[in-house]
Amino acid sequence: MRLPRFFALLLAFRLPLGALMAANPPAVVIATYNVENYLGEEAVAAETGGRRSRPKAEKAIDAVVQVIKDINPDILGVCEMGEPERFEDFKRRLAGAGLGYRDFEYVQALDSERHLALVSRFPIVARQSLTNVSFELAGRPEKVRRGFLDVTVQIASGYQLRVVGAHLKSKLPTPEGEALVRRNEALLLRKHLDEILAADPAVRLVCLGDFNDLKNEPSYHEITGARGKTYMTALPARDELGDTWTEYWKAADLYSRIDYIFVSPALHREVAPGSPRVYRSAYWNDASDHRPVYATIIPSNRP
C-alpha cells in the first residue's frame, strides 16, 4: 500500500506528527555561509587563471564546523563547497558535531570546483535548482557558473519555505568584465525570482548567498527589484558591535558586506525583530574570509 506523501515524509525523517501538524510551527533559523574553498587535493581555481588551489586545511575545517555549531541554523545555504566527496565530508563532520541535518541539496553547474549546497533539518519536498543558465555578453554565449540553488522545504503542515541560493561572479578581473558578468547573473536570478512570485504571490521566499556586490551597486538592485509587491528585502544584519561587513578581502585590505538574505513580502513579516545577525567570534577568520549571515523566522499559518 502506498502511503500519502505527507505520512511518507514523517516516516522518512522520523518527525513527530505534532511537529508538522502544529498550528504554530517552530521558529526556524536560516543562514548563509561562504565557507571559502572547501576543496580537495585536486581542485583548480578556474577564476584565477587555472592556478591550483590549496585544499582546505583541517584547522580551517574545524573552525567552519564550530562556526556553524555556534549559529545552529535549521537551514544553511553554503557557497564554495567543493567536489561531491567534499560535500560528503562536510555532512559527516556536521553530523559528528551533533547538528542533525536530514536533507541536502548540491548543485553541479559549470564551475566544477565551487558549488552551491544546502543542509536542512526539515524535509526538502521539491527541487528546482538550475544548473544550465545561459546569457549572451558582447555577442558571446556565457553561463552562470554556479547555477542557482532552489528547493522547497516543508517546515510544518501547510507551511513551506522556498529557498533560492546564489553565488555571483567574484570581483576577480576577467576579459569579458567581471561586473558585467555579475550583473547579467543578477538579472537572470531576478527573472527566476519573478517567475516564482508570479506563480504564487504569497510564497514565503528567501534568496541567500554571496552576491559579490555592495548595496549601492547594480547587481544588488537587480535582485531587490522595484518597490512593491514583489520587492525582495535585504535583512539589515549586523554583529554585536554594530558592524555589517561579511567579507574580508585580504589582497585589497577591504571589509565589505556582500553576503545577504533577501526575503519576499510574505516572509518579511515573519522575520523575528532584531534576529538578523552577522556572525562574530575570535576564530571567524580561521574558518573563512566570509562571516555568515543568519536570521530567525517565526512561522505563521495565516494566508
List each model region and its residues.
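Structured beta-strand-rich core segments of catalytic domains in phosphoester-bond hydrolases
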Residues: M81-Q160, A166
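Bacterial N-terminal signal peptides
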Residues: F7-A19
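N-terminal, active-site-proximal structural segment of metallo-dependent hydrolase catalytic domains
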Residues: R2, L20-A97, D103, Q108-E113, ...
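Catalytic metal-binding/acid-base residues of hydrolase active sites
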Residues: E36, M81-G82, P123, H167-K169, ...
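Metal-dependent phosphoester-hydrolase catalytic domains
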Residues: K143, T152, L193-V206, N212-P303
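Metal-dependent phosphoester/phosphodiester hydrolase catalytic core
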Residues: V44, I155-A186, K191
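Active-site-proximal beta-strand elements of phosphoester/diester hydrolases
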Residues: A27-G40, L130, Q160-S170
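Second-shell loop/turn segments in exported
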Residues: T48-P55, N72-E80, E105-Y106, L137-A138, ...
